[in-house]
Amino acid sequence: MFRGATLVNLDSKGRLAVPTRHREKLNEESAGLMVCTIDLHQPCLLLYPLPAWEIIEQKLSRLSSMNPAERRVQRLLLGHASECQMDGAGRILLAPTLRQHAGLSKEVMLVGQFNKFELWDEQTWYQQVKDDIDAELSAELPLTDRLQDLSL
């Protein structure tokens, strides 16, 4: 399970160093092989260890290519999916098209989300956190039954 938000730097070649605390688990789970794709609802990227991504691919393969909405999701997720191999220094290379989609520059937030990471431009991340907190405080959105039962 991946958790926590860490500021990492993107180098001039488009590589980012995975924090040391995650490297061992990624090497155990996937020999350092990951898949990066776009998020359909947020200006960020999703980075999965290969076994977790393969589960997503199986679900996508069950969607109908004849249904326009399902085909659109397949096209966006699979069409942007890019394999990333962690090198000996713990770095992964992000494709230019993916970096552009998320507006990534030098400073990137690597955010653990259970079985994957989100990759955010640092300033966009902080704005998203602010917006999320503001939405919670204003109670604009009704709580789902699951959220009402969640005790922290």
Swiss-Prot record:
InterPro entries: MraZ, MraZ_C, MraZ_dom, MraZ_N, MraZ_sf, SpoVT-AbrB_dom, SpoVT-AbrB_sf. Its main location: cytoplasm. The keyword Transcription regulation applies. The keyword Transcription regulation applies. It comes from the Bacteria. One of its GO terms (molecular function) is DNA-binding transcription factor activity. One of its GO terms (biological process) is negative regulation of DNA-templated transcription initiation. Keywords: Cytoplasm, DNA-binding, Repeat, Repressor, Transcription, Transcription regulation. NCBIfam families: division/cell wall cluster transcriptional repressor MraZ. Negatively regulates its own expression and that of the subsequent genes in the proximal part of the division and cell wall (dcw) gene cluster. Acts by binding directly to DNA. May also regulate the expression of genes outside the dcw cluster. Forms oligomers. PANTHER family: TRANSCRIPTIONAL REGULATOR MRAZ. This is Transcriptional regulator MraZ. It comes from Sodalis glossinidius (strain morsitans).
